[in-house]
Structure formats: structure tokens, C-alpha cells
């Protein structure tokens, strides 16, 4: 489940 971590980081960044 490494993709989940990347998605969270991207979302935060985007926000």
C-alpha cells in the first residue's frame, strides 16, 4: 500500500 502514502502527500500538497 505504498500508493496510498503518495496519494496523501499529493493531496496535501495540492491543497
Curated annotation (Swiss-Prot):
Chief location of this protein within or outside the cell: secreted
Tissue specificity remark: Plasma.
UniProt KW Secreted keyword: yes
RNA-binding as UniProt keyword: no
This protein's GO CC annotations: extracellular region
GO molecular function: lipid binding; metal ion binding
Domain of life: Eukaryota
Protein's cellular compartments: Secreted
Keywords, alphabetical: Lipid-binding, Metal-binding, Secreted
Function: Serum albumin, the main protein of plasma, has a good binding capacity for water, Ca(2+), Na(+), K(+), fatty acids, hormones, bilirubin and drugs. Its main function is the regulation of the colloidal osmotic pressure of blood.
Family per similarity comment: Belongs to the ALB/AFP/VDB family.
Note: In the red-eared slider turtle, there are two forms of albumin, ALB-1 and ALB-2.
Name of the protein in its database record: 68 kDa serum albumin
Lineage: Eukaryota, Metazoa, Chordata, Craniata, Vertebrata
